[in-house]
Amino acid sequence: MCIRDRDIESLVIPHGSAWGNTSPPMATWSNQLNGKEHDPKFQNLIEIFSGHGNSEEYRSWEAFNEVEGGLECPSPTDNYLPDCFQAGEIIRERCRVSAGDENLCNIRAEEARNNFTNANPYGLLSIPNNRPSEWLNSGQCQDCYLPAFEYRPRSSVQYALALRNFEDKNSEPFRFGFIGSSDNHSSRPGTGYKEIDRIRNTDSKYKSSNAFMSLGQSQQSFAIPRSQEINLEQMIDRMKPSQGERVASFLYTGGLIASHVSQKNRESLWNSLNTREVYATSGERILLWFDVLNHPSGIKPMGSEFSMSKNPVFQVRALGSQKQIPGCSSDNQLDASTLNRLCNGECFNPVDERNIIQRIEIIRIRPQTYPNEPIETLIEDPWKIIECEPSQEGCLVEFEDPNFLNANREVIYYVRAIQAPSLAVGAANLACEFDDSGKCIEVNLCGDIEGQGEGDCLSDNEERAWSSPVFIKPTLN
């Protein structure tokens, strides 16, 4: 309100929206999609990726089921293990180890699930002396790209784009362009140029050899085989329990925002932000264009919003990031001691060779047209996949939506340009070990000597760029 009243040129950019370390389990964009909470004049961009992970993808599972009178603990799905359910499994295993009979252990497991659910958002406290490894991969999006920790799907970017408010006549839909950022809290932006130095270039500081960082986790001998009820009235002044050891496996070197401008000055950059002619990357300097070719007034770039009386024809151009070599360029004007202080002697140091773009993924979202229209049926991810020929010249593809006019509804399109696999910090997340049925049976935490180690926790990753969407409504002849 202060910004609006003073007529200050401003942008309000939500960030880390699906990050569950700070958002409660049932967080949803529907709480903000109203005339009071959302003003598209200021809020037309969103951070889709950062050092705290990816907030892009929607999934239909939830941490709890909403039922009349409260919440209940859902069962696991193929790609999601609820924390509340795992709370029961922790107590069941502790009960088994302490020689409890099967019936007693089942009763205590059910009790633990209920205690965890009733203690929301302090459920972790219902399991006495819980250890990070006991939670396995619970609470995580297991099939998302570099996901945010404790993923909140109804706070994802895709959910926001598909959502509509049919009750508030003053509400405008979310029409977000996409940005990326580092968000590493160290005043060192753009740290994704090389996948090195986890402690310096990410928020992941955990080392199990450091007694302070390990928070004195209890040993198995103190694993009490029964959960406890939590009095929420006593939690009013208490912060939500920290999961620093697990969070460390979901922190990355961060993303970038890229802008399409004809001049490198503040005015041009500011204009591109306001017109959404920007895109996000996972940290690599990937070049990306996404245009509609056949609009009557000419080419419409990413971020555009318009109507059409014909099926849209799209073009995507993508060029991989430049490959990096160790160290800093000999042309650098800074002395060695300064370079070591600023970036540990590792600069953006490209060679004249680029990483290969492997494929283009197209995502199609059809926003809701009536109240409670199921969101999961409206997000097609991916709608199309187009493979690219390996080339130093990048990738150029065109495609059409032949069903746009027949659908007779607004459609949102955006693309991802995917690079060939390369190593990245934290890309394996919890590095689960699976049994024959595909169930996670052991985790290897980043920063843990007995897990992925205290180094950079490197694993294969497909770096990418996300275009801002185009928003198209049909105009019937």
Describe the predicted segments one by one.
Residues 1-3:
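Short, small-residue-biased leader/transition segments that mark boundaries at the very start
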Residues 5-11, 16-477:
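C-terminal functional module detector
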